[in-house]
Amino acid sequence: MEDLLNEVVPQEDLERFEKKYHHELELDGEVTTDTKFEYAFCLVRSRYTNDVRKGIMILEELARTHPDGRRDYIYYLAFGNARIKEYTSGLKYCRAFLDIESNDQVRSLEEYIKKEIDKEVAKGMVVAGGAALVLGGILGLGIAMARNKQKREK
């Protein structure tokens, strides 16, 4: 799953679908559902976080307004959120998908996200533990210095 999440869309594909998207927008003032999806699909696979976020926004709009493709939209919402390390949102979309139907690829993505959440929690605990040690050391040093000062004054 990690390999799939790290796979990046070729720049020429992204540019082609971006051009198609903007062409339809300029021509008709509206973009077809298929073109929106193709563009969003490329964006969530971009190497740039802002592109991924833009793809997520398009997919969210599609999921709200076009229930026919909701299954695909929800999967790529989970996928895009996992790519930008928005694991809580990614997990929410995985669960929403699995409520619709069982799918091994989505289960695999869900497991990957859960492992990444566990890693983040562990990192947070290490940082908190390190901060507590530093604070304890500073407090201990302060107490030792105060005692030393009291001894000198006597």
Swiss-Prot record:
Subcellular location: Mitochondrion outer membrane
Coiled coil: none
Residue ranges crossing the lipid bilayer per the database entry: 125-145
InterPro entries per UniProt: Fis1, Fis1_cytosol, Fis1_TPR_C, Fis1_TPR_N, TPR-like_helical_dom_sf
Principal localisation: mitochondrion
CDD domains: Fis1
Topology feature Cytoplasmic, residues: 1-124
GO molecular function, one term: lipid binding
Sequence ranges on the Mitochondrial intermembrane membrane side: 146-154
Gene Ontology CC annotations of this record: mitochondrial outer membrane; peroxisomal membrane
Alphabetical UniProt keywords: Membrane, Mitochondrion, Mitochondrion outer membrane, Transmembrane, Transmembrane helix
A single BP term in Gene Ontology: peroxisome fission
Phenotype reported upon loss of the gene: RNAi-mediated knockdown results in elongated mitochondria.
Record carries keyword Acetylation: no
Record SUPFAM superfamilies: TPR-like
Membrane topology per record: Single-pass membrane protein
Stored PANTHER family: MITOCHONDRIAL FISSION 1 PROTEIN (PTHR13247:SF0), TETRATRICOPEPTIDE REPEAT PROTEIN 11 TPR REPEAT PROTEIN 11 (PTHR13247)
Described function: Involved in the fragmentation of the mitochondrial network and its perinuclear clustering. Functions downstream of Pink1 and upstream of Drp1 to regulate mitochondrial fission.
Family: Belongs to the FIS1 family.
Domain notes: The C-terminus is required for mitochondrial localization, while the N-terminus is necessary for mitochondrial fission.
Protein name per UniProt: Mitochondrial fission 1 protein
Lineage: Eukaryota, Metazoa, Ecdysozoa, Arthropoda, Hexapoda
Gene label: Fis1
